[in-house]
């Protein structure tokens, strides 16, 4: 027979154990929550500035094979000054570039998926260090969605999606395009793809300052709005993205073709020719072939494969110039 005193003692011990565990959990929570945030760097080091130079040269040259060399320099600068938001973002971008243009690789290793994880890590650092930079927010959301797609992680997909909506609110001219580009590989009949295409139209509206005619979306009337200052500067070419304008219309045209609206896509593609830098654009031949083959490309663009040749019939997001299309000089 159990002693009533023994039963009572066991109850007291059980309560004490639960209380101790709760207290310990509370202490752990408080210890973590009250830890100081990593402080942003007050200045940028000479090492970081030298790494910047190599980063931009590699990107602007479209030197995909030079990514590893640039990564060494930029990560070295980050380790020296881990509070440098710009350097953290550059590491993230190199990882996302290597993943985005993986069609360039002759033999693709499963290890390429690590670039999505590392891109998210470094863009997370950049956002934490400089939460006011909306471009970092958009890149973080993009990397979250890329990682989620690889791992079939629905929770991370939703987190990335809503973070992207926040990024759009923070800088619509920039992140509406970013968001739509990320959605372009989705099935053409999916809600996400349709939303992504709507975001491209909204980008045009934001940049034009009015609603662009959906039936005849020539951008010729708005070319006088070209600016290098303010939030609308990202609508145009710049030293960061020397062919941003052309690349935008390449992607939007691809999305319209994929959606089956190849006739409107031809007008959208043709807008790229309005750029004063069009003659120097490395991918103008690809765009002109897309105009010619717009109707034939409807079926091709709905395939999920990635292209191997520069002119392969795949959407820009799946091509060898997924980033270089805007950034290569």
Model-derived features: positions:
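Bacterial N-terminal signal peptides that target proteins for export
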Residues: 2-16
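Bacterial N-terminal signal peptides
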Residues: 14-25
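Bacterial Sec signal peptide processing site at the extreme N-terminus
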Residues: 24-44
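Short coil/linker segments at helix-helix boundaries
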Residues: 33-40, 49-73, 93-132, 138-238, ...
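Extracytoplasmic c-type cytochrome modules immediately beyond a signal peptide or single-pass transmembrane anchor
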Residues: 65-68, 73, 194-203, 212-231, ...
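TPR alpha-solenoid repeat register
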Residues: 87, 136, 174-177, 248, ...
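The canonical Cys-X-X-Cys-His
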Residues: 319-329
């Amino acid at each position: 027979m159990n002693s009533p005193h023994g039963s009572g003692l066991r109850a007291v011990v059980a309560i004490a154990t639960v209380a101790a565990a709760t207290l310990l959990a509370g202490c752990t929570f408080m210890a973590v929550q009250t830890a100081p945030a990593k402080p942003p760097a007050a200045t940028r080091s000479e090492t970081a500035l030298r790494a910047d130079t190599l980063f931009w040269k590699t990107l602007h040259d479209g030197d995909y094979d030079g990514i590893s060399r640039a990564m060494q320099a930029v990560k070295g600068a980050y380790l020296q000054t881990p509070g440098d938001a710009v350097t953290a973002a550059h590491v993230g971008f190199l990882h996302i570039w290597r993943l985005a243009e993986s069609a360039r690789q002759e033999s693709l290793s499963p290890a390429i998926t690590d670039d999505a994880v590392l891109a998210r890590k470094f863009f997370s650092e950049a956002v934490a260090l400089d939460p006011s930079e909306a471009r970092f927010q958009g890149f973080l959301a993009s990397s979250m969605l890329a990682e989620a797609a690889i791992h079939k992680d629905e929770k991370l997909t939703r987190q990335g999606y809503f973070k992207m909506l926040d990024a759009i609110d923070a800088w619509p001219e920039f992140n509406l395009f970013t968001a739509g580009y990320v959605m372009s590989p989705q099935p053409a009949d999916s809600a996400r793809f349709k939303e992504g295409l709507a975001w491209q139209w909204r980008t045009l509206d934001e940049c034009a300052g009015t609603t662009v005619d959906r039936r005849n979306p020539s951008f010729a009337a708005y070319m006088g709005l070209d600016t290098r200052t303010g939030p609308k500067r990202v609508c145009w070419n710049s030293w960061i993205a020397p062919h941003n304008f052309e690349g935008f219309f390449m992607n939007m045209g691809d999305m319209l073709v994929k959606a089956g609206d190849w006739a409107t896509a031809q007008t959208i593609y043709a807008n790229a020719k309005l750029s004063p830098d069009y003659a120097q654009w490395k991918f103008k031949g690809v765009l002109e072939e897309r105009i010619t083959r717009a109707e034939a490309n409807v079926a091709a663009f709905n395939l999920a494969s990635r292209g191997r040749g520069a002119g392969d019939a795949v959407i820009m997001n799946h091509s060898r110039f997924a980033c270089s299309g805007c950034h290569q000089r």
